[in-house]
Amino acid sequence: MTTQVVNVIGAGLAGSEAAYQIAKRGVQVRLYEMRPVRQTPAHHTDKFAELVCSNSLRANTLTNAVGVIKEEMRLMDSVIIRAADECSVPAGGALAVDRHEFAAKVTEYVKNHPNVTVMNEEITEIPEGPTIIATGPLTSPDLSAQLKELTGEDYFYFYDAAAPIVEKDSIDMNKVYLKSRYDKGEAAYLNCPMTEEEFDRFYEALIAAETVPLKEFEKEIFFEGCMPVEVMASRGRQTLVFGPMKPVGLEDPKTGKTPYAVVQLRQDDAAGTLYNIVGFQTHLKWGPQKEVLQLIPGLENAEIVRYGVMHRNTFINSPNLLRPTYQYKQRDDLFFAGQMTGVEGYVESAASGLLAGINAARLVKGEEPVVLPPVTAMGSMANYITATNAKNFQPMNANFGLFAPLEKKIKKKAERNEAYATRALETIRNFVNI
């Protein structure tokens, strides 16, 4: 076993996964996590891999690229996906988790590994020696300054937003119904139907509600996948009806008709006592937020246990700075992982940590770092963040559009996606022992 130690900075999804992958390969890890010594504006605990936005890791089927990346990670012994599978809650065709159990499970698996030493302290300078920086969207100011100096480039700022969570007991169950869209999977969502009149009243209140002011020096650049509901509404009333309040496939069993609009609630904990409001990430002040949410049928007396909040997100210009191994181009033993690389989403962040961790371990053992082919979901993400146009670089979720093209064109989308998935999983099996 090598005597060299790899520093991993940040015990979020990417950092926890990276530390585990390094440790299981017989390499010592120093895992630095500043919480609880210093908290961030969005975290509430000292647990690893705390989910600060939704509790859903999105689609769990192979007809979706994020489902494929999960299956690749299962084959590669991902600690994040293992913990998620063990802490899952009902969510139709998605993989959602009890966020508290999930974070506790990841913490247990990583912290208890004999090759992992946890250091609860803030890192303000980039260490010498093999290092993975996985400090995420809320990198502390001191380390951010160091990274700016290192890269010679400014960061890009945007906001991720978290949706409110309500107590199930406070929901008027006479006004809502249990159903998944198009009846896919088990009936996993509580649906709050709206008439056009109810929607109009809600919409007018939403666009008039007061938001928390942004700081002058921060530019508003929202990632489309986690955009505040009031920002979507400001683009026009139909944006909501065709977005998070889309009613298609959600016929009301009481009337047999499709409502004008629907607000969906998704189970947030294993006990089924908490529900989050799907797609309702928001930056509204808490008073106006409560008033607006209580205009939703069934939520008139809702007890809000967590208000929607927003936090800054930060990412580097990876096409200029990184290789598809997640190595920094100017320093072979420095790696980046997680959302700061421009991969967007919980699963994608963990996947980047998995690959960065494997490559950091290989580096200190004198082995060549691995580049996963872009026919795989993980390889396509690494390829996207390092080979796309640097000038217009934006965060991206896993999607089949990033995969290398199929050899033969397939017209039907379902068959095409199945072909992408089959090829990806056949390929990734060649890498399970790296």
From Swiss-Prot:
Its main location: cytoplasm. Keywords: Cytoplasm, FAD, Flavoprotein, Methyltransferase, NAD, NADP, Transferase, tRNA processing. This is Methylenetetrahydrofolate--tRNA-(uracil-5-)-methyltransferase TrmFO. Its EC number is 2.1.1.74. It catalyses: uridine(54) in tRNA + (6R)-5,10-methylene-5,6,7,8-tetrahydrofolate + NADH + H(+) = 5-methyluridine(54) in tRNA + (6S)-5,6,7,8-tetrahydrofolate + NAD(+); uridine(54) in tRNA + (6R)-5,10-methylene-5,6,7,8-tetrahydrofolate + NADPH + H(+) = 5-methyluridine(54) in tRNA + (6S)-5,6,7,8-tetrahydrofolate + NADP(+). One of its GO terms (molecular function) is tRNA (uracil(54)-C5)-methyltransferase activity, 5,10-methylenetetrahydrofolate-dependent. Its cofactor is FAD. Catalyzes the folate-dependent formation of 5-methyl-uridine at position 54 (M-5-U54) in all tRNAs. It comes from the Bacteria. FAD binds at residues 10-15. Belongs to the MnmG family. TrmFO subfamily. It holds the Pfam family GIDA. The gene is trmFO. It is found in: Cytoplasm. One of its GO terms (cellular component) is cytosol. It comes from Bacillus cereus (strain AH820). NCBIfam families: gid_trmFO, PRK05335.1. GO terms for biological process: tRNA methylation; tRNA wobble uridine modification.
